[in-house]
Amino acid sequence: MKLYAISDLHLRHNDNRLALQALPAHPEDWLIVAGDVGETLAEMELMLSTLTQRFRQVIWVPGNHELWTLPSEQPQLKGEARYQRLVSLCRSYGALTPEDPYPRWPGPGPERVIVPMFLGYDYTFRPDHVPADKALEWAWEDDLLCTDEVLLHPEPHASRAAWCAARVEATRARLDALPPGCATVLVNHYPLRYEHVRLPRIPRFSIWCGTKQTEDWHTRYRAEVVVSGHLHMPATLWRDGVRFEEVSLGYPAQWKYRGVHAWESCLRVILPGPTP
C-alpha cells in the first residue's frame, strides 16, 4: 500500500485531460491531489469522478485556480462560498478535504496522520527590506501580476491576506490538538517555507506563494513529509531531516518531455519514502 501525490493538473488543457484518462488504476493506494485541478466545477468533477475510481482514497486541498470566480461560470460563487462548494463536491465522491477529520495512514510503518490544509498566502514571501504595503508594487516592478488579484475573491474576509490569517489560525488550533508525538504528513498547495520558492525567472512572484507563518511547521508539528505544489517545479528537498516534496504536473509544455507515461512518472511516492 502506497501514498501518492500529484498537484497542478490544470485540466483546462486537453493534453492534461487525456493524460488523466490514461492514468492506470491503483486500487490499493491513496492519492493526494494538492491543488490547481482546474478553474471550473466541471474540471473538478472530472478529476473526482476519474481518480476516486482508481484510488482507494483521494485527499484534496485547494490551490488558487479552483478558487477563481470566472465570469463565464454560473453560479457566481466567491471566496468562502466557492470553497465550500468545492468541499461539498469532494464529499459527494468520498474524497477528503481540509474540512474533514485528519485521516490516519492505514499503511505500514509508525502511526501517522495526514493533514490536508488550506492556508492561502499573505504576501510575506518577500525580502525583509520590502515593506508589507509595497509588496505588490515590488512585484509590479518586474511586470508581474497574479491573476488572483482579479479572480480570487476573499469574501467574506477583507482581503486575501485576512483570509490566510484566519485559515492559519484555525489550522494551527487543529494541529496543536493532535496527540503529542504523532507524526504527520503535511499537505498544502503552497510551500511552507520561503526558501523553497525557487523561481529563477520570476523571483518576485514569491509573494503569491505562501506565508512565513508556516516556516517552522515541519518541525513544530512533527512532519515526516511535507507535500506541496504551485511552483510547477517537481523536486525532493530536505530540511531538518524532513522531506519536502513538490509534486506539480504543470502545463503540457512542462511535462511532455518526460515521455508517454508522464502522469505515471509524475505520481510522487510519499509513503513509504526514502531517508535522507
Language-model segments: residues:
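N-terminal active-site segment of His-dependent metallophosphoesterases
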Residues: 1-60, 66-72, 157, 275-276
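Beta-strand-turn-beta hairpins that frame and shape the catalytic cleft
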Residues: 1-4, 102-116, 238-243
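Active-site neighborhood of phospho(di)ester-bond hydrolases with catalytic His/Asp-centered motifs
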Residues: 5-7, 31-36, 59-64, 96-101, ...
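Metal-dependent catalytic neighborhoods of phosphoester/phosphodiester hydrolases
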Residues: 15-19, 39-53, 65-93, 106-109, ...
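Short amphipathic alpha-helices and their capping/turn segments at secondary-structure boundaries
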Residues: 46-52, 97-98, 103-109, 132-133, ...
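Binuclear metal-dependent phosphoesterase catalytic core
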Residues: 93, 198-199, 204-207, 211-224, ...
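Active-site-proximal loop/helix segment associated with metal-binding centers of metalloenzymes
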Residues: 113-185, 190-201
